[in-house]
Every structure is written in C-alpha cells, then in structure tokens.
Amino acid sequence: MLDNIKIGLQYCTPKHALTRLVGKLASLEAGKLTTAIIRWFIGQYKVDMSEARNPDPAAYSTFNHFFIRELKEGARPINNDDNIISHPADACVSQLGPIKEGRLFQAKGHYFDACELLGGDKALAEEFVDGDFATLYLSPRDYHRVHMPCDGTLRQMIYVPGDLFSVNPLTAQNVPNLFARNERVVCIFDTAHGPIAQVLVGATIVGSIETVWAGTVTPPTGPEVRRWDYPATGTQAIVLKKGQEMGRFKLGSTVINLFPKDMVRFVEAMKPEQPTRMGEPYAELDSSEKE
C-alpha cells in the first residue's frame, strides 16, 4: 500500500519545478546552515568521507560542492589491462544483459526501447542491435562523478528532454519505460573496439547533468532533442582516457552503458544489486575482439 502511494506521488508531484527549487537551494552558500545540512546528509546516508580529497564538511561552501566532491588520489585505482572495461561509477547494478529485439530489461515485466533511449535515432540504435547493456544506479551516498570505462573519442552528445521520475529500485519496478522517458544526456564514443554509449539519466531533484567538455548540459531544459557532433581527429577532437572523468550529477541518478554485439562479456561479479566501484573490472573484451 505504501509503495503504491509513493508511486502515485511520483505521477502527481511537479517534478521539474521541485528539481529547479532543490537545485537552487543546493547552490546556496549558507555558511553554518550548509555545513549542518552536509553533516546531516553524511550521517543519514553513511557517506564515507575518509575517501574524499577534503573530508571536512565545513570546507564545502554549498551542498552541490559537497555532492560532487573529489576523491583522494589513488582512492579508485583504474584497472590497466587493455582487455578490461572498467566501471564508470560508484553505483549498484540495477540490471544488465543482452539487448533483445532493440529492448533493454528494466525490471520484472518492464522493458524499454534502445532507440527511444538514444533520442529516437534509428541509425544509432542499429549500432547496438543484439549488443549488451548495463544500468547502474548511483545512490545518494555514492561518489557522483562519472568516468570513462575505456579510451574513447567523443562522436556525439544528445540531450533528450523528458520527465524526472525518481530512478530508485521502487520506481524501476513500477514505472513503465522509466529510463527512456526521463530527461537524459547520451554520449557516444568511438573506441578501438567499437562504439559505446554512456547515457546519464536525470531524475527527481537531479539539479544538473554536466560533462567535462560542455559544462552544464541541463538545466536549462527544452522541449526538443538537441545534438552536438564532434570531430574524430584534429585539435578539436575530444579524446578521453580510461578512468578519466567525463561527467557528473549534482544529486545522483543512473548511468546506462550500451555495447555492440560481441564486443564485451561482463565479469562474473556483475549481477543485479551488486555494488560497483569506479575503475574496477566491468567487462572483458570478447575473445574475437582481442585478436
């Protein structure tokens, strides 16, 4: 009954207005009040500040500064095996598996469409037909910077407008087409082994999605899909190394990765509800890709 009420509130709440309000509040410099809120948040969600570059809550002038805190150097060693794809974020595995008939598994009884997820680009979706996907949920306690799972050259960024449902396990199990209806930023990278998609999905009170090359992508929001194309070579090419930061959430959300057919094989530890740490092994390149 309580779960039904929570889901009902998701549909009734003015989520965009609430998110804008929370984003503004999280950017306020309120001195001791900000510090008190940060301390409460740390205690409430059991945030491990020993890993932070600056573990002192009073050092953060706004809640957003705290939320996108950097980690100490060496806190997340990057697996340097060229045949290993590394985790892009501290998170929890929501779902993973094959892309079947252009659809990705969301939760029991729910699937969502790869083409819709990618902003309705059929040609782009074709690149991932019969491929593999993983959905990673970043909880409030997690480190909220997102990194590259392998070396890649940015080909395209797509902003897709949408709703702002919460993306926690309860809503994933109860809101149809959740990840393809929420606002999101799709990043397509070309790698030595094929293209990959890294999709940053917005949610209720996610005040901002940013990338290292474009800064804040949202807000502002808009009614239209927007696309940016990037050169593959030359001084304007955006080339990011494995483990390098590529984006961040100001208040957390979800990362979805898409891989082409036969490119990767997820490591054995990759299972739903399994915690992940950025830089640790995520998937192995398929044996045919290694040759």
Swiss-Prot record:
Q: Which organism is it from?
A: Photobacterium profundum (strain SS9)
Ordered alphabetically, the record's keywords are:
Cell membrane, Decarboxylase, Lipid biosynthesis, Lipid metabolism, Lyase, Membrane, Phospholipid biosynthesis, Phospholipid metabolism, Pyruvate, Zymogen
Q: Which Pfam families match?
A: PS_Dcarbxylase (PF02666)
Q: In which pathway does it act?
A: Phospholipid metabolism; phosphatidylethanolamine biosynthesis; phosphatidylethanolamine from CDP-diacylglycerol: step 2/2
What is the annotated quaternary arrangement, including any partners?
Heterodimer of a large membrane-associated beta subunit and a small pyruvoyl-containing alpha subunit.
- Active-site residues are 90, 147, 253
Question: How is the co-factor bound, per the entry?
Answer: Binds 1 pyruvoyl group covalently per subunit.
Q: Where in the cell is it found?
A: Cell membrane
Q: Where is this site: Cleavage (non-hydrolytic)?
A: 252-253
Q: Which gene encodes it?
A: psd
- Protein name in UniProt: Phosphatidylserine decarboxylase proenzyme
Its Enzyme Commission number(s) read 4.1.1.65
A single MF term (Gene Ontology): phosphatidylserine decarboxylase activity
The family assignment reads: Belongs to the phosphatidylserine decarboxylase family. PSD-B subfamily. Prokaryotic type I sub-subfamily.
